[in-house]
Amino acid sequence: MTTTITITRPDDWHLHLRDGAALSAVLPDSARRFGRAIVMPNLRPPVTTTALAYAYRERIMQAMPAGSGFEPLMTLYLTDNTSAEEIDRAKASGIVHGVKLYPAGATTNSDSGVTNIGHCVKALEAMEKHGIPLLVHAEVTDVDVDVFDRERVFIERNMVPLLERFQGLRVVFEHITTKDAANFVAGAPENVAATITAHHLLMNRNAMFNGGIRPHHYCLPVLKREEHRLALVAAATSGNPKFFLGTDSAPHAKSAKEAACGCAGMYTAHAGIELYTEVFDAAGSLDRLEAFASFHGPDFYRLPRNTDKITLEKTAWEVPASLPFAGDELVPLRAGSHISWRLKD
C-alpha cells in the first residue's frame, strides 16, 4: 500500500519568479504546489518602489495558470536611497509584505543593494513602526572574507548591531546555511525568524564537486559542510516556529549556468514541496512537515493559514533532464534522477 500524507497547502516564503517569458515558464510549478509566495524583487531594474511592485504583481497575475488561486506576496528592494515615505506607501498598498536587504554584490542582480546599513535608518524605522519584515540576505561581501564564512561574519558584524538598534524590527534571516545561523535564530527574540531551502537541507558542499564541477549545484549562499546541513535539518524538523519553508528557487538558463562565470541559483520549484517531504521523511519527522511548510510562515507574517489541503504519496518519479525556459533550457534539481515523493493531482 502506498504511503500518503495530507497537509494544509504550504506557502513558499522565498521565491524567484523572474519576469517576461521566464516568468511564464516557471510560475505554473509554484502555483500548483503553494498557496502563496514571497516574491523576490531582484529584477533588472529592481523593484524598489510600491508602484513597481504593483506593476510586477500585475505581470505575475497575467501569467497565472487558469483557475489558479496562487497569491504573489510582493516585496521591495532596499537601497541606500529608500525613503520612509516609500515604506509608508508600501504599508498602505496592502500588497507589499516585506523589504529585501541585499548587501551590494552579494548575489544575482544585487548591484543596487545596500552599501551601508547606516544609509537605511529612516526606512528601517518606518518598517519597525509599520511591522513590515526586513528580509535579509545575510552575507558580507568583502573580498578578504572566505566565501564559506560570509554568513557567520555577517551575524557578528551586521545582524547583531541591527537587532540591537532596531529592537522592534521584524527580521527574516533568509536561506540560512550554517549551524551558526540556526543557533542565532533559535536564541534570538521572537521578532526574528528564518527560511531554510530544500537544497541546503539535502546537500552539503561536496555536491558542487562530485566527479567534477557541478554548476547546477552552485547557489548563494553556497552549500556548506555536512555539520551545517545536519544543524539545518535539526532546526527545520524541531517544531520551532522560528523556522519555515523558503525554496529560494532561482531559475537560470542552462547556458547561463554552464559557463565560464556561471550564475548562482538552483531551480527547485518543480518539486518545491516534494523535496522537503524527502527531508522530513528521512529524519523520521513527517508529523512536523505541515507546521514547517504551512503554519510557521503565515503565523510570522501575520497572515491566515491556508484552508485547502494537498496530498503527497511516496512514489518515486524521474525529473526531466531539462525544462523549456524562455527560448533556452532550465535544468531542475535532480535532473535525470528520481525524487521519492510525488504530489497527487
UniProtKB/Swiss-Prot annotation:
Pathway: Pyrimidine metabolism; UMP biosynthesis via de novo pathway; (S)-dihydroorotate from bicarbonate: step 3/3
Residue numbers binding substrate: H16, L17, R18, N42, H137, L220, H252, A264
Family assignment from sequence similarity: Belongs to the metallo-dependent hydrolases superfamily. DHOase family. Class II DHOase subfamily.
Lineage of producing organism: Bacteria, Pseudomonadati, Pseudomonadota, Betaproteobacteria, Nitrosomonadales
Family annotation (PROSITE patterns): DIHYDROOROTASE_1 (PS00482), DIHYDROOROTASE_2 (PS00483)
HAMAP family: PyrC_classII
Organism listed in the record: Methylobacillus flagellatus (strain ATCC 51484 / DSM 6875 / VKM B-1610 / KT)
UniProt keyword Zinc, yes or no: yes
CDD domains assigned: DHOase (cd01294)
UniProt-listed GO biological process terms: 'de novo' pyrimidine nucleobase biosynthetic process; 'de novo' UMP biosynthetic process
Enzyme Commission no: 3.5.2.3
Residues reported in the UniProt entry to bind Zn(2+) 1: H14, H16, K100, D248
Cofactor annotation: Zn(2+)
GO-annotated molecular function: dihydroorotase activity; zinc ion binding
N6-carboxylysine carried by residues: K100
Active-site residues from the entry: D248
Sequence intervals crossing the membrane: none
Positions with a binding annotation for Zn(2+) 2: K100, H137, H175
Described function: Catalyzes the reversible cyclization of carbamoyl aspartate to dihydroorotate.
Reaction(s) the record says it catalyses: (S)-dihydroorotate + H2O = N-carbamoyl-L-aspartate + H(+)
Bound cofactor: record note: Binds 2 Zn(2+) ions per subunit.
Name of the protein in question: Dihydroorotase
Classification via SUPFAM superfamilies: Metallo-dependent hydrolases
Keywords, ordered alphabetically: Hydrolase, Metal-binding, Pyrimidine biosynthesis, Zinc
